[in-house]
Curated annotation (Swiss-Prot):
Cofactor: Mg(2+)
Protein name, per record: Phenylalanine--tRNA ligase beta subunit
Entry-linked SMART domains: B3_4, B5, FDX-ACB
Subunit structure comment from the entry: Tetramer of two alpha and two beta subunits.
Gene3D superfamilies the record matches: 3.30.56.10, Bira Bifunctional Protein, Domain 2, Ferrodoxin-fold anticodon-binding domain, Nucleic acid-binding proteins, Phenylalanyl-trna Synthetase, Chain B, domain 3
Gene: pheT
Amino acid sequence: MLVSYKWLKELVDIDVTPAALAEKMSTTGIEVEGIEVPAEGLSKLVVGHVLSCEDVPETHLHLCQVDTGDETPRQIVCGAPNVKAGIKVIVAVPGARIADNYKIKKGKIRGMESLGMICSLQELGLSDSIIPKEFSDGIQILPEEAVPGDAIFKYLDLDDHIIELSITPNRADALSMRGVAHEVAAIYGKSVSFPQKNLQESDKATSEAIEVAIASDKVLTYASRVVENVKVKPSPQWLQNLLMNAGIRPINNVVDVTNYVLLYFGQPMHAFDYDKFEDHKIVARAARQGESLVTLDGEKRDLTTEDLVITVADKPVALAGVMGGQATEIDGNSQTVVLEAAVFDGKSIRKTSGRLNLRSESSSRFEKGVNYATVLEALDFAAAMLQELAEGQVLSGHVQAGQLPTEPVEVSTSLDYVNVRLGTELTFADIQRIFNQLGFGLTGDETRFTVAVPRRRWDISIPADLVEEIARIYGYDKLPTTLPEAGGTAAELTPTQALRRKVRGLAEGLGLTEIISYALTTPEKAIEFAVAPSHLTELMWPMSVERSALRQNMVSGMLDTVAYNVARKQSNLALYEIGKIFEQEVNPKEDLPNEVNHFAFAICGLVAQKDFQTQAQAVDFYHAKGILDTLFANLNLKVQYVPTKDLANMHPGRTALILLDEQVIGFVGQVHPGTAKAYSIPETYVAELDMAALEAALPSDQTFVEITKFPAMTRDVALLLDREVSHQTIVTAIESAGVKRLTKIKLFDVYEGATIQAGQKSMAYSLTFQNPNDNLTDEEVAKYMEKITKSLTEQVGAEVR
């Protein structure tokens, strides 16, 4: 937000330097990025009156005689296409300094003496993006009242101090001059002085000319006024100066008025050419799939059902809250203007502007919030300005659809609550003084008082917000300072810390690289891979929709990282993360979410590169499962893998739930090809585990098992069974035989082919037996194999080959 110090002083009677003001604002909660004076570095720039202008034959040059307040006119050679006799211009006399510290000297051009330079605004250092288009390719023409020889700075307000504020999402009220004025008035104990406009209305009612309606719950209110017989022309110089100093290009008096109101009230507005309407009813609704709109920048925008549009005759004429449409824009022939003042859902506007990469001053304010109480006041103010600057006739009244609460919000607390949290000994009189400076109403006493918070401060809704306001105005530098008190802690890791350290070591030993992803994501991604989604916990004032909800899974964030790396030609990835997910079992507005530690990893690409000995090997489900098997083995935990098709974003044939003591603690598998395509990533395998469940299941004592000196015996068995029987089912059947000496089950072959009946497969296992106290005999092992074979036959219908 760029704040004009001159304009601010018109609204608040302060007598401090811009630097002192910036320092004070920074220490009370609104950071000042810097102060800029447009005239800084410029010198000897004066008003010139072009007395005569003659074309130089066979060139684009003009030989001008210019009155700069000296005894005799000054001859200047100028190449600007818009220079002519009779206009007032900017003249840099010899010795002047212009942009980039360039010094002007006397010189000769084509043999003609030139005693100075007639300047454009670009040559004074102003950006092309804010210069009026009529002067973008030529020199700036000054107002008629400019006096030759005067310094030009006061005519263009280049001597103003422009204070750049860094506005956080919770202080969007300061995205307006009135909001900044209220803040400065509170800091210095002053009162604000806002100019009033005398609106003269005609006998004809606005309702006779226009009708408005709302057809979406994302449009909170929509109001319009009509101004007839306007004369579209350039704005007066003071208004152009003000807009350029705020970083906005002047267009014409009608559009400039809407931008002025935007800066003054923080209320985005739009002006339509009424005569270009095909109907006299305006409807604000959601766009339909397949609709499109050519916006004011000449770009055709394809719309989705997530976008809001303003329609006339059921055709979009504006992209609500973002940019108007080209078909109804104000031009030099416009005579009747429809003014729009509305409030749109900030999340919807953020999605639209982000999707289209179309950020504007209006969309920024709708995203962060506008003052409900001044929507109609801003509309009336704009109409009065058009009456004043465009000689328009304002129709009586306004038309409006949708009502907004405008009364103050009441928040109650006590003096003890404030003092305990600030460590102060403030009196109730101190509290009264502070809220009086802020312009807030106050009733009650020190035991219990209620503050009436104006709608312009929509960031204040709970007692803690009041404490912050008190601290800001009282002065952070006045708060007592104390050293933190902390008792000694035992020099050992907690069980949670120990588990995190062990899992981290195992993951890195398996070749995984740790990442840290955002805990905040989009509402859609927050629940994308959650096994059991809960209520969403969303920020009230998010910086962007991409960081608006607390995650309920970690995989979606990892896939964002995978996509980032793949887009940069890094496709062989093995990543892991240990972090928190946030489960909300109750209303998020009433209680905080539960924070649960999770472990997740993602692998894609090649696990082994091609070389002279081996072929390249791509990652697959078994690589992902192998990582987990190693993890569980080192944690001394026994889990089950159960195939599942219930996770919508996972491959239905290559995904398994992970069960520990019959409870689901996570999943492993391939990301669904459709989801992978949406993320623009290759075939990727992921897993996610609940570390809290792992910690709870860890054995309390580690029992040492002596390494036996007796050898193990191995037997292989090949099974013919139905194609649908899983490896886990076979392992369960083998274990259910109850053979104590069975120490290891290993699958070493799976075969389906011409020698196997259709619908069947062959699976071969290696079974390891060992007695820690004695040698095993062949007869004992044969009995074990007989029990296992019987179990396999009875439970899975296996045929031993």
